[in-house]
Amino acid sequence: MKFAVIVFPGSNCDVDMFHAIKDELGEEVDYVWHDRENLDEYDAILLPGGFSYGDYLRCGAISRFANAMKAVQKAAEQGKPILGVCNGFQILVESGLLPGALMRNENLKFMCRTVQLRVENNETMFTSQYEKNEVINIPIAHGEGNYYCDEATLKQLEENNQIAFRYVENPNGSVSDIAGIVNEKGNVLGMMPHPERAVDELLGGAEGLKVFQSILKQWRETYVVNA
């Protein structure tokens, strides 16, 4: 399986993503600059955290216009797994690939610590290796991680089982304690916590590795077992 880590000016978690895929998952991965127009050779696309374009205007508001995002849109339409973490989640929302918005944290402060997440839906291609309602420890590092959507959108997310992760103790004011959501098709996941920073016990825990293992399992079952 071949992964692409999209690198924007200001990305700073691309190295963590690369490490998670190459060193922990053992799969092929490339850094891909944001001006790349074709991502057809990749099986999965990863949008890392950071401060793309300095977070000017809004977080992710400029990155959505990058050439690579047109290719990401195409990959999403093809059903390829797309994972956006932190700033990557913000870019997915700004691009319209996921509903809602990410606002300033309720306390107006940047937060960097480990939090507990509850796995709300373990039937997605990103969460199949977890147990439903499993509680995992994953780091956060954001100032604008307060997820917001209107009541109609929240109802739709709940009815369609699109809420992948919730905070056990809400750190930022996100509506309905939402930490991560998938699109209706189930192949695009956006989450504020950083699973790529929790893939090795030496780094404090490996409970985020199952996100990437789930992606790999889905791909193998689809393209290897059925080949």
UniProtKB/Swiss-Prot annotation:
Pathway: Purine metabolism; IMP biosynthesis via de novo pathway; 5-amino-1-(5-phospho-D-ribosyl)imidazole from N(2)-formyl-N(1)-(5-phospho-D-ribosyl)glycinamide: step 1/2
Superkingdom of the organism of origin: Bacteria
Active site annotation, chain numbering: C86 (nucleophile), H194, E196
GO terms, biological process: 'de novo' IMP biosynthetic process
S-S pairs: none
Alphabetized InterPro entries for the sequence: Class_I_gatase-like (IPR029062), PRibForGlyAmidine_synth_PurQ (IPR010075)
Gene Ontology CC: cytoplasm
Single GO molecular function: glutaminase activity
UniProt entry tagged with the keyword Ribonucleoprotein: no
Entries under Pfam families matching the protein: GATase_5 (PF13507)
Subcellular compartments: Cytoplasm
Catalyzed chemical reaction(s): N(2)-formyl-N(1)-(5-phospho-beta-D-ribosyl)glycinamide + L-glutamine + ATP + H2O = 2-formamido-N(1)-(5-O-phospho-beta-D-ribosyl)acetamidine + L-glutamate + ADP + phosphate + H(+); L-glutamine + H2O = L-glutamate + NH4(+)
Keywords (A to Z) from UniProt: ATP-binding, Cytoplasm, Glutamine amidotransferase, Hydrolase, Ligase, Nucleotide-binding, Purine biosynthesis
PROSITE patterns the record matches: GATASE_TYPE_1
Segments forming domain Glutamine amidotransferase type-1: 3-225
Coiled-coil residue windows: none
EC number, UniProt record: 6.3.5.3, 3.5.1.2
NCBIfam families: FGAM_synth_I, PRK03619.1
Function, in words: Part of the phosphoribosylformylglycinamidine synthase complex involved in the purines biosynthetic pathway. Catalyzes the ATP-dependent conversion of formylglycinamide ribonucleotide (FGAR) and glutamine to yield formylglycinamidine ribonucleotide (FGAM) and glutamate. The FGAM synthase complex is composed of three subunits. PurQ produces an ammonia molecule by converting glutamine to glutamate. PurL transfers the ammonia molecule to FGAR to form FGAM in an ATP-dependent manner.
Assembly: Part of the FGAM synthase complex composed of 1 PurL, 1 PurQ and 2 PurS subunits.
Protein name per the record: Phosphoribosylformylglycinamidine synthase subunit PurQ
Source organism of the structure: Bacillus mycoides (strain KBAB4) (Bacillus weihenstephanensis)
Taxon lineage: Bacteria, Bacillati, Bacillota, Bacilli, Bacillales
